[in-house]
Structures are given as structure tokens and as C-alpha cells.
Amino acid sequence: MVIFSSYFSKQMNRFSTPFVFFFKKLNNTLKKSLQFIMRFHSYHPMFICLLRDSSRNENRKKKVSIGLRTIMRAFSFLMQVATCLIRYSLILTCLVAILLSVLWRIQFAALRMHDLIEEELKMFVLQHNCTLADLWSGKCPSSEDE
């Protein structure tokens, strides 16, 4: 879990987004919760399982929780899934930001083009002394006729 936590920290340091602070806080919270679980396990008699302690007498057995190991495996798996989701959500956020930037530039260019066309139409109508309805119906003389 410590390896995963340091890997998670290194990955988060690679991104310079506003979300980094939040994810660092999340990482610290997860570390503290893991430490709490380990302390709870060492003092709580509810988790009982027998594992051999190879450093001591072979007949002595150490109480360790199968339930805790299962919880820790599930927790580790969920953390890996969360890391993938965070990584891909950051990548997706960057892609969406790029897409929105491109769309905003296209929209800005289209609005400028619309304004230019509108100005040209107004000037054409004023020069030829006709209305927009005349222009659309074809009654207004074109600049090629002159």
C-alpha cells in the first residue's frame, strides 16, 4: 500500500492542474485511514486467524485477520481503480478543455465573420438605395450590373 501511495503521489505531481491539491489531500486522508485500520487491527480481538510466526517458535501462532487481509485487498483494488479513474478523468478534462478552446475560437471567428457580412450587406443596401427584402428577392441591382 505504501508503494501504491508513493506511486500515486508521483503521478499526481506530474499534473499541474487545480485538482492536484484536492487529490493530494485525498491521498493523505487515505494514508491516515490505512494507518487507523492497521492500529485498529492490532488492538482489536475481533479479527482472529492463525498464521505461523516463522521468527519465533513454530508452535506459537500469531492472531491475524483473514477479514482484514480481505478488506485490505479490496481496499488496494479500489485504490487502483480510483487511480485509473483519476488519471483518465484528468486526461479527459484536458481533452475537453482543449476541445472547448478550439470551439470557442471557431465560434469567435464565426461571430466576427457574421459581423463583417452584416456590415457589408448594410453598406451594399445603403449604396444601392434598396431594402434587404429587395436584395433577397433579386430586385436590388448587383454590383456587377453597374
UniProtKB/Swiss-Prot annotation:
One cellular-component annotation, GO: membrane
Entry keyword set: Cytoplasm, Meiosis, Membrane, Transmembrane, Transmembrane helix
Record localization: Cytoplasm; Membrane
Membrane topology type: Single-pass membrane protein
Biological processes, Gene Ontology terms: meiotic cell cycle
Source superkingdom: Eukaryota
Location, primary (coarse class): cytoplasm
Function according to Swiss-Prot or TrEMBL: Has a role in meiosis.
Protein name: Meiotically up-regulated gene 96 protein
Organism from which the protein derives: Schizosaccharomyces pombe (strain 972 / ATCC 24843)
